[in-house]
């Protein structure tokens, strides 16, 4: 069966051309409390000295699908492959990076989507509103679920790593942002391969043009070359820099 997709669904809103994000706000403001109250079994226990309530929350990352494809991968699927990819930074890059920190960041960067979901530009949620939802979700995790676990230190560390990724100022965070894009391009190529040329996802490939580090650009070039060889002489949407 041919898969379906939404052309801008998996793109990072920060990388989209201006105008693709809608500034409209929901009539009923989104809140962590509202989502948590709707969870099966009710809200997890707050202010517990055990991390088990938080472990239950992580299940949502396993079951919440990434947007953009039918039968898409889960958020955890995406973050797990990203975490492994960080371990393969070539020496010219790894010598300048704290690789274990990058791996941790890859495993944390989309954690807020356990409650927020995988918001995409077509959802009509403005970037400030998206940031608000994700930030308040991380605050809920760290202040309500993890505040008494290891004296709150583990939760505070998760929050700090997530914020570092969001700020995208350190070399580690820039690398993980690039890995996020590479994982998307990998998935694009793999979905096309599974569909045996019945599905052209070339509209996703421009994401590669926003990769900043040369070593990761080299991976992207290899992937796009692989894609061209796969399509051969068959007409398809080609990668164009924007």
Describe the predicted segments one by one.
Residues 1-242:
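Alpha-helical, largely C-terminal catalytic domains
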